[in-house]
Regions:
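A compositional/structural signature for long, glycine/proline-rich flexible linkers
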Residues: 2-367
């Protein structure tokens, strides 16, 4: 995104901070979802849409693909493109004390449609994913489908967390084999028909949040707006639409990304009240980096007020915890599934990669 030249009022710091705060959830999740679907350098990438990736070993400190990776659960990721056809995913039964299915789209609202805490995963389950824009599907029931999940975005993630019981070798082996039984098919494929052709699409460049805010934020937000369902009665939805409208970003506006360089700016004639230039991009970056630092301080504080307010469904989130969860590390389980308390140092200083740190918990302190 970028101070205004042609608008007499311009963009002040307060306006820009509001734009960044309202946009953060979308840009963060755009980067996450597209990385897991499209980034060939992401070791956990599915290698495309409507495909799955199953981990084969528990995460450790070397894992960089996920912010705050759990080291006691394994992941099975499914990245969804719901534009041309619904996607049907088969989930097997697991021999595990904890399994949860988490879904989210570019808007970063989190749903847990299945979990062992709700009695799920005792038997196989087939789920159909779709959106209001999915072509050729009107919500009609499909034989063999157990559950239907309407997503808020055309591009989305659905992934499992599985406690594999690593201390029990046979149980671990069984769960690793079961993870490979998760399959994703378009509805046409599920019904034994050829897959429908899907319109090829060029995504605005994804990467680090600060880079996108500086060089491509407006293009990413326009893309996101075109592929997200907004609720006219939802305060946060309407606030982000209002914040971006002066920049010319509105749902349904077409633009051509054919000549966009990596994290650069294609030539687009924005119908904007405020014109942006390169200096604005740098300012957006500074604000985004400051918000990320503020959010990390909140997250790591023993007095973090948002432990029970993050990773919730639409309608149950407020802006402050949404910004914090998006800036610190997108995608997580709500408090009834997992907790994310911050861990600080004994001297109160920030952790430094030059040092080693030891975290000790007694057996009685473990959950």
């Amino acid at each position: 995104m970028s101070s205004s030249k042609n608008n007499p009022t311009g963009l002040n710091t307060e306006n820009m901070r509001n734009i960044v705060r309202r946009s953060y959830q979308y840009i963060a999740m755009y980067n996450v979802i597209n990385s897991f679907a499209l980034d060939e350098y992401n070791p956990m990438s599915t290698g495309g849409w409507n495909k799955t990736y199953a981990m084969t070993a528990l995460a450790d400190h070397t894992v960089r693909a996920i912010a705050r990776p759990n080291n006691d659960t394994l992941y099975v990721l499914t990245m969804l493109d719901l534009r041309g056809d619904p996607v049907v995913v088969h989930y097997p039964a697991f021999d595990s004390k904890f399994v949860s299915l988490e879904t989210s789209a570019y808007d970063h609202y989190v749903d847990i449609p299945l979990s062992t805490t709700k009695g799920d995963f005792k038997k196989p389950m087939t789920m159909l994913y779709y959106t209001d824009r999915t072509q050729g599907y009107d919500g009609a029931p499909v034989e063999g489908v157990d559950k239907y999940m309407k997503m808020s975005g055309d591009f989305a993630s659905a992934f499992l967390r599985i406690m594999p019981h690593a201390a029990e070798p046979e149980r671990l082996k069984k769960n690793l084999a079961t993870m490979k039984e998760v399959t994703a098919k378009t509805l046409s494929e599920y019904l034994g028909k050829p897959a429908k052709p899907v319109e090829k699409i060029r995504f605005p460049a994804f990467g680090r949040d600060a880079d996108v805010f500086e060089k491509g934020g407006r293009y990413v937000m326009q893309f996101v707006f075109n592929h997200t369902t907004f609720d006219p009665n939802d305060e946060m939805d309407q606030a982000v639409l209002a914040a971006l409208k002066p920049l010319g970003v509105e749902p349904g506006q077409y633009f051509n990304l054919a000549n966009q360089p990596a994290l650069g700016s294609p030539t687009i004639q924005w119908k904007a009240e405020i014109e942006l230039d390169e200096s604005d991009g740098k300012k957006f970056r500074e604000i985004a980096e400051k918000i990320a630092q503020e959010s990390l301080a909140i997250w790591n504080s023993p007095d973090n007020p948002y432990l029970f307010d993050v990773f919730k469904p639409k309608g149950k989130m407020t802006l402050e915890p949404m910004v914090v969860q998006s800036a610190v590390g997108p995608i997580g389980n709500p408090a009834d599934q997992a907790m994310y308390p911050g861990i600080g140092t004994t001297d109160g200083k920030s952790m430094n990669a030059l040092n080693d740190y030891v975290i000790r918990m007694s057996k009685d302190q473990l959950p």
